[in-house]
């Protein structure tokens, strides 16, 4: 019965993670389109994160009252504060990087996350690296295969496999036409995105640590959003002190982007914390290579972009790597469950002997 419950939880978690990664690609595309209409990165982050804090406030109160949780100590709050500082830094560099480049490059560079996260998880003993265990080998091989697949999608186009006769949504394609960037902007954007995707794995590890101390995703998300919005506000006010007009929001795609971000980001972050709590940081990071495949598929479906052989081959490799890691995580979870089941009767016998 317990194994069935675990399988259901894993299925729900997998579905939620796929949905959030798809939503994240769409959010990045919407943000890039909004920047072409004058939206500033600081404006988006500050307003959307303030909205996110308000959205999370009721769930934080409900979660705090309805569950038996350890006290929210100053030490835990300080760690959430450090997480907020990390988040503010990689959010600012990430969105400014997208502003200079485009969402596809952001998805491509984010593929360094699994490798860095896996290395950090081994260093902090959150993951095992043993060539004697099939689950560990599967996770390592799957991570490498996913990274290779992502590189194939980015670096190799090949011949066209599929070309739509006309874009399904011509108005949307027209809106997203200004998303191209110059070569110099592309390099600046790439450097900023690389900094962001070096900090993200560090945040994943810290999230896992905080979830062990205080397993309440909505409460941690609320304080994270609150701290990140305050820190981003301070940085934004200093950085844009000579440009006060950026704080004025117009009733167009810029407002839509801010509101959608304020609603989407809290759920996105809470699901990430839930995934880290139940599966660890590597599970969270392995979904990043899927983002480049999702971006290619969404471009073909909604914008009428051509689908190339490189995208097909890379997509197959990403899928193989992803499912290999999932198999490794499932086998690891099954082994832990069986060992726990074996230990429980022994524990009961020891208690009976003592009585």
Curated annotation (Swiss-Prot):
GO terms for molecular function: transmembrane transporter activity. It is found in: Membrane. Residues 29-154 form the EamA domain. The keyword Metal-binding does not apply. It holds the Pfam family EamA. It comes from the Eukaryota. InterPro entries: EamA_dom (IPR000620), WAT1-related (IPR030184). Keywords: Membrane, Transmembrane, Transmembrane helix. GO terms for cellular component: membrane. It is a multi-pass membrane protein. The chain crosses the membrane at residues 11-31, 42-62, 80-100, 104-124, 136-156, 186-206, 218-238, 244-264, 290-310, 311-331. SUPFAM superfamilies: Multidrug resistance efflux transporter EmrE. Belongs to the drug/metabolite transporter (DMT) superfamily. Plant drug/metabolite exporter (P-DME) (TC 2.A.7.4) family. This is WAT1-related protein At3g28130. It comes from Arabidopsis thaliana (Mouse-ear cress).
